[in-house]
Amino acid sequence: MNIYAVGGAIRDELLGVPVQDRDYVVVGATPEQMIAQGFRPVGKDFPVFLHPDTHEEYALARTERKTAAGYHGFQFHYAPDVTLDEDLARRDLTINAMAREVSPDGTLIGPVIDPFDGQRDLRARVFRHVSDAFVEDPVRILRLARFAARFADFTVADDTLALMRRMVDAGEVDALVPERVWQELARGLMEAKPSRMFAVLRDCGALARILPEVDGLWGVPQRADYHPEVDTGVHVMMVVDYAAKQRYSLPVRFAALTHDLGKATTPDDVLPRHTGHEGRSVDLLKPLCERLRVPNECRDLALVVAREHGNLHRVMEMGAAALVRFFERTDALRKPARFAEMLQACEADARGRLGLEAQPYPQAERLRVALAAARSVDAGAIARATGSDSAKIKDAVHRARIEAVAHALEIGE
């Protein structure tokens, strides 16, 4: 029995970046031998075991063969005679197909085992497929795109890009289940440069299949006085990258991605103006979230940002009454944490514009001060003083909030 650390841990070690977790492959063992040594079986489709002390995953060396469409359509073969090279050959990219032997005490020993020249491609900053078997698993397109968001200075090898396009043309991407698409998109959005993920997906044609609402934004012009970058797709990528640079949460980054979807459906005869695009964005976003099973916290923030970002940009023009109505409409009084994320997404929208990345955004501070004032109103005390008429209570609380905001901002109602 020989144990090897494989994949991302070796890649990251060679790149000099922190290794988050390790994957292990065991060569020359049977499931019975693993169990006898205290490993706990957890794999469903193929033998994966948890180490009795560290609880890290150890998989028996295996090969795989495509038997049906989609990423579930594989038949696995594992046996003590499956070699390390055979196991590495089934992996997606050369930079993920390297290994080092592990000693009994868990330390890495010996040289890097690199049968597919992954070290060469690391030095060249290239994503390259290990073999033509890459075409058998459509998830690999999403994974490669996600890696592009993490390693933003890497490029895709020409022959690898050609394989990805063949997969898209063959409909392989259409077989992906929504949960897996969302999982990879979400992970890519949380990387350092999400725009690189979308660039790769566009280059191979996959974005039009999995997120046609986003793909349709490129080539749509905007007013240059508001958007010096002009192209809506370019703008949205700048917004997402700004959100990533600020280390904003996944809901904020998803809201940044989807806030302008409606601009793709603006009639040609009114371009480059986009009057009413906020409502059209909401209409596109709802079925998108349903289709990809987007988590509620991401969906809810994205919807309110899509609907209200134009209004939020104009809050410097609002009086106290309009601000309180805005807080009520966005549920900011009950959900201040979500409203804070809404401010982040809208600030990213304002700064995701060519040459305007550092422009002031006083709207955010104005709204923070105003919301704090509105939430300081003691609705319970007003209710006790007003009586049992719910309509009168509601009106009194509303008026008190307007007065509080007006006082805090020193503005008229």
From Swiss-Prot:
Reactions it catalyzes: a tRNA precursor + 2 CTP + ATP = a tRNA with a 3' CCA end + 3 diphosphate; a tRNA with a 3' CCA end + 2 CTP + ATP = a tRNA with a 3' CCACCA end + 3 diphosphate
Pfam families assigned: HD, PolyA_pol, PolyA_pol_RNAbd
Statement: the UniProt record of this protein carries the keyword Nucleotidyltransferase: yes
Cofactor binding note of this UniProt entry: Magnesium is required for nucleotidyltransferase activity.
GO biological process: RNA repair; tRNA 3'-terminal CCA addition
Sorted UniProt keywords: ATP-binding, Hydrolase, Magnesium, Metal-binding, Multifunctional enzyme, Nickel, Nucleotide-binding, Nucleotidyltransferase, RNA repair, RNA-binding, Transferase, tRNA processing
The protein's required cofactors: Mg(2+); Ni(2+)
Gene3D superfamilies given in the database record: Beta Polymerase, domain 2, cca-adding enzyme, domain 2
Residues that, per the record, bind ATP: 8, 11, 91, 143, 146
EC numbers: 2.7.7.72, 3.1.3.-, 3.1.4.-
Entry binding sites for Mg(2+): 21, 23
Domain of life (superkingdom): Bacteria
GO molecular function: ATP binding; CCA tRNA nucleotidyltransferase activity; cyclic-nucleotide phosphodiesterase activity; magnesium ion binding; phosphatase activity; tRNA binding
Binding residue positions for CTP: 8, 11, 91, 143, 146
Residue ranges occupied by any HD domain in the UniProt entry: 232-333
Remarks, miscellaneous: A single active site specifically recognizes both ATP and CTP and is responsible for their addition.
Subunit structure: Monomer. Can also form homodimers and oligomers.
PANTHER family assigned: MULTIFUNCTIONAL CCA PROTEIN (PTHR47545:SF1)
Function: Catalyzes the addition and repair of the essential 3'-terminal CCA sequence in tRNAs without using a nucleic acid template. Adds these three nucleotides in the order of C, C, and A to the tRNA nucleotide-73, using CTP and ATP as substrates and producing inorganic pyrophosphate. tRNA 3'-terminal CCA addition is required both for tRNA processing and repair. Also involved in tRNA surveillance by mediating tandem CCA addition to generate a CCACCA at the 3' terminus of unstable tRNAs. While stable tRNAs receive only 3'-terminal CCA, unstable tRNAs are marked with CCACCA and rapidly degraded.
Domain notes: Comprises two domains: an N-terminal domain containing the nucleotidyltransferase activity and a C-terminal HD domain associated with both phosphodiesterase and phosphatase activities.
Family: Belongs to the tRNA nucleotidyltransferase/poly(A) polymerase family. Bacterial CCA-adding enzyme type 1 subfamily.
Protein name, as recorded: Multifunctional CCA protein
Organism (species): Burkholderia multivorans (strain ATCC 17616 / 249)
Protein's gene: cca
